[in-house]
Amino acid sequence: MHIVVCIKQVPDSAQIRV
């Protein structure tokens, strides 16, 4: 579940980067 990590890291750039 790296998607959640991306949202926490860059919620502005990668809201839900799959």
From Swiss-Prot:
This is Protein FixA. The gene is fixA. May play a role in a redox process involved in nitrogen fixation. One of its GO terms (biological process) is nitrogen fixation. Belongs to the ETF beta-subunit/FixA family. FixA and FixB form a heterodimer. Keywords: Electron transport, Nitrogen fixation, Transport. It comes from the Bacteria.
